[in-house]
Amino acid sequence: KEKYPNLPYFILGHSMGSFIARDYVATYGSEVDCVALCGTTGIFPNLAEGMKLCQEHIDEGKGDESDPNVAQILLGWMFQRCTEEIKYGNEWSCSDPIVVYNAANDPLCSILRPTTNRSYLYFCQMIEAITGPSWAEKVPKKLPIYNVAGDEDPVGQYGEGVKQVTQWLEDS
């Protein structure tokens, strides 16, 4: 804004980026002119259970380790859309097997790399902060927000999570 004061400042957040964008606008929303959220979600399934397990691992000194059970608790629900055998671990992300294969074999794609227990706890804390009417109350009322998702997007809970977020904003 300092370098280009006459240009509008937009944020586009997709999937996990939409969570970060929501967290950002709750604090700095007056600094942006518009937000587009693509594939965001409302109430995150199994959040409390995942947070508890992450905190237990951290308390045991295992914060920098990775427990696949944490990923299963927090993200396993996204695989419900998968009707075929799970080969790569990213099948939830797209119904096109070629896209799934290419992403799984892309050395720059980090979606399949292990995440530490501490990172998952930070993720859970962010999700907790952007969930519900208390989050929506922090977002500037006049900030235009475009909220979109596909009806086959598991992160957006097949459109239902996006509707929840929209409702929180409308109610605030």
Q: What do these predicted ranges mean?
A:
Residues D23-P114:
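Alpha/beta-hydrolase-fold enzymes
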Residues P154-Q164:
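Conserved alpha/beta-hydrolase "acid-adjacent" motif
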Residues Q167-S172:
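Catalytic histidine neighborhood in serine/cysteine hydrolases
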Residues P114-A136:
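Active-site nucleophile elbow and catalytic-triad environment of alpha/beta-hydrolase enzymes
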Residues Y4-S15:
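Alpha/beta-hydrolase fold nucleophile elbow
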Residues N147-A149:
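Short beta-strand/loop motif that positions the catalytic acidic residue
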Residues G13-D23:
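Glycine-rich nucleophile elbow surrounding the catalytic serine of serine-hydrolase chemistry
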Residues V139-I145:
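Short, proline-enriched alpha-helix->beta-strand connector loops that line the catalytic pocket
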